[in-house]
Amino acid sequence: MNRRQFHAGAAGAILLEMLPGCAGTVTQSKGAHLATVDTHAHIFRRGLKLANVRRYAPDYDATLNDYLGMLDRHGIARGVLVQPSFLGTDNSFMLAGLRQAPGRLRGIAVVDPDTPFAELKKMNEAGVAGIRLNLVGGAPVPDFWSAPWHTLLTRAADLGWQVEVHREARDLPRILPPLLNAGVNLVVDHFGRPDPALGVNDPGFRFLLETGASRRVWVKLSAAYRNGADGAGEKTALAAIPLLRNAFGMERLMWGSDWPHTQFEKSIDYGRARKMLDIWLPNPDERKVVLVDTPTSLFRFA
């Protein structure tokens, strides 16, 4: 299947070899796959209407059937479809996917602040469990203290939704406070996106750790490769894990594959992304919390 198979190249193999304990020594606990949840994946196909403002657009398809097959091959019971940035606020393809596998999937939508409550309720009925603020790559940060945003955030809280934040760590100190003030639960993507040069010493990442005391912030252990090239992101992940554990507890951490690893298809694949969690968390009891208990509750699979 050429690119659609998303095979990892030699560079990805080198990254794993750089990390301790990678030589096939870590195995998944028996039975854990029965209820495991992948909390971060995207589906799309060529020909869909693209957002007017976008950083990129893939030149291949990543369909629902592709994703469900990937889950099956890796023993993952459930998945969460996150609206891709390049599709903007047109969530129709993602919603169609949710309706085809209602018991197995949940969704995270991207919406405008003036989206009618009735439309949000329809999304909720389809399996949407939250909204995403994809602000990475220099996108302007909205005024989340403003009335339109406060209304949206309040409605999200009323629905029991989470708000997922994707932004470089340096800006988290000005983004997270108004969101927490609105009363919603927050999920921060990809280890909080610390600066590759600073790693866990990034002041924004340190601020993220402080929000653990709120008990309303979760962090995705996902896409470490987006936080630094040539293995730097993976090394930052290893350094971040004990800090995140201490600040949030295992019950506020989740794993996501980030499939189909857009813009990194040649250096990572699904199996490698899943194995990274075994490296980060060699304790099977901790992995069960991250893979099963926490996402099952937060995404309302139970």
Descriptions of predicted regions:
Residues 37-41, 80-81, 107-109, 131-133, ...:
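Hydrophobic faces of well-ordered beta-strands that scaffold small-molecule active sites
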